[in-house]
UniProtKB/Swiss-Prot annotation:
It catalyses: ATP + protein L-histidine = ADP + protein N-phospho-L-histidine. It is found in: Cell membrane. The modification Phosphohistidine is found at H299. This is Sensor protein RprX. Pfam families: HATPase_c, HisKA. The chain crosses the membrane at residues 5-25, 260-280. It comes from the Bacteria. The keyword Chloroplast does not apply. It comes from Bacteroides fragilis (strain YCH46). Its EC number is 2.7.13.3.
Length: 519
């Protein structure tokens, strides 16, 4: 699959996941906003009803105290008699209706007859005397009730005016029963669906706090609500109740918490998708690097095979057989190229180490200074071939480590070989090897004056198959396994390695290995 196709699919899927995540976040934000508005509306409705309840309570208390039986009864019962005869009970009640000036307007008698078994009363009205008939008496009763209603209305208006006048002079503590106020708050909050812990306080017209509940906590204006207790009072004399909900945020969050798992699942899918795309690109890059490796490996094998083939053909020449010196020379070439080919095969076999968790190491006590000196003596001829020089500063006073001699030797050799491969064509190679001690560690540095490494490539030099060059041209011999092998061996020895480099200046590799014994 082409890289451009992977990018297009990745962008489409990524945008789809991001859009889905954005919609979920927007939906949660809208739900939180809606729940807040719903909560605010419910609380304000409850507080408004509390205000009405408090006003009603005060009005009822005033009416019970001030209204008296001031009006006269126009309809009064004058007498009552009871007779029992032949199993019947007869009750007679006589009523007189008087006009406002006190004169007798009409009189009638109400008789009720009850039989003992059924207890069902029977009533009839008998006219005794007066100027009016029963219909006229009924009209008189209606007028009297109407007059009584008007009187009571005027009486209530008078009481209300006096109540408002006197109430404005009383303190809020005298006007409100705080225990009842708490009950009103609780019942109205429940009626409006707000079943949440609340704290409240009462503030008088001067802004002083005259009451607060025992566990009151002021959580700021966002979670607090205020409501005038007596809305008809003048603004200068108005008292308010302040209610705070300490668990409001948790209450709002709990109402939308069912969406959180869905959003988390989407985020997990997005992360998994990103990781999958990363793996796809990494595998594609690894494939390209393997192809590059095959090209380089083919070139590395082609040269010794061609040389051996040519030498084998020369041996068929009868003239070669007659010249012992020529025969010995050709045999030496075949032997050298065979060793070279075997060495390349061994390097390819190093690939299998990267598929194992840990290499098989033959650990023993080593003097790192002596080991490095031996490698330098062997490698000096190759450096001199390029008109270079190699120096050493073996300053480590405690160079003893517990390591695999063969693998550590290969590590030093590979790092020196890299210095030769990446030397500047126009300058002579200068290679320096240094050792020193740090607490509990042996430090080894190998520094050259080669072409250097770009910063963006520096962190990749230890990757398998990675080689610092342009394109797939075989400009430097090797398979791209050397530094990956070096890093793995150092890590298997519980050490660390890092690279420091500057383009066109040189590269420095620093190795830290644990000492066998601390001084």
């Amino acid at each position: 699959m082409k890289k451009s196709t992977i990018w297009i699919l990745g962008i489409i899927m990524g945008l789809s996941f991001l859009s889905l995540l954005y919609l979920q976040v927007s939906y949660i934000e809208e739900m939180v906003k809606m729940r807040k508005e719903q909560f605010n509306t419910s609380v304000r409705n409850a507080l408004f009803q509390v205000s009405k309840d408090v006003e009603y309570d005060e009005t009822q208390r005033w009416l019970l105290e001030d209204i008296t039986e001031a009006e006269r009864r126009a309809l009064a019962q004058s007498s009552s008699t009871t007779e029992q005869k032949n199993g019947l009970i007869q009750q007679s009640e006589r009523y007189r209706f008087k006009s406002p000036d006190g004169t007798l307007y009409s009189e009638f008698e109400l008789k009720m007859i009850t039989t003992e078994p059924s207890k069902v009363p029977k009533a009839m009205i008998s006219e005794r005397h007066g100027r009016n008939t029963i219909p006229q008496t009924s009209r008189s009763l209606t007028d009297a009730i109407k007059n009584r209603y008007m009187y009571q209305r005027f009486l209530l208006d008078d009481v209300a005016l006096r109540m408002i006048y006197k109430a404005s002079d009383k303190s809020i503590g005298e006007r409100v029963n705080f225990k009842k106020l708490d009950n009103y708050l609780k019942s109205n909050f429940i009626n409006n669906g707000v079943e949440l812990l609340y704290h409240f306080s009462v503030i008088d017209k001067d802004g002083r706090e005259v009451y607060r509940c025992s566990d009151y906590e002021d959580g700021g204006s966002e979670d607090s609500y205020t409501q005038p207790l007596f809305q008809n009072d003048p603004p200068a004399k108005m008292s308010i109740v302040k209610v705070h909900f300490p668990g409001k945020k948790d209450y709002i969050f709990d109402s939308v918490s069912f969406m959180i798992p869905s959003m988390i699942f989407t985020i997990v899918l997005l992360i998994t998708f990103i990781f999958t795309i990363y793996i796809v690109f990494r595998q594609k890059k690894l494939t390209e690097m393997k192809n590059d490796f095959i090209n380089n490996m083919t070139h590395e094998f082609k040269t010794p095979i061609s040389t051996i083939s040519l030498a084998a053909q020369m041996l068929k020449d009868p003239a070669v057989g007659k010249s012992p010196q020529m025969f010995q020379h050709i045999s030496g070439v075949i032997n050298d190229e065979t060793k070279r080919l075997r060495f390349q095969v061994e390097k390819v076999l190093q690939m299998s180490m990267f598929d194992r968790q840990k290499a098989t190491l033959k650990m023993k006590e080593l003097d790192a200074n002596e080991l490095i000196t031996g490698v330098i003596n062997t490698f000096a001829l190759k450096v001199e071939r390029y008109n270079g020089k190699i120096t050493s500063n073996l300053e480590a006073t405690n160079p003893v480590i517990f390591a695999d001699e063969m693998h550590i030797t290969n590590v030093i050799f590979n790092l020196m070989d890299n210095a030769v491969k990446y030397k500047k064509p126009e300058e002579d190679l200068v290679l320096n090897v240094r050792t020193w001690n740090e607490p509990g560690k042996l430090m080894i540095s190998i520094q050259d004056n080669g072409i250097g490494i770009k910063k963006e490539n520096l962190k990749k030099v230890f990757d398998k198959f990675y080689r610092v060059h342009t394109g797939n041209l075989h400009d430097v011999k090797g398979f791209g396994l050397g530094l990956a092998y070096v890093k793995k061996i150092i890590q298997d020895h519980k050490g660390t390695i890092r690279a420091e480099s500057e383009l066109n200046v040189g590269t420095k590799f620093i190795i830290a290995l644990p000492l066998l014994k601390n001084d």
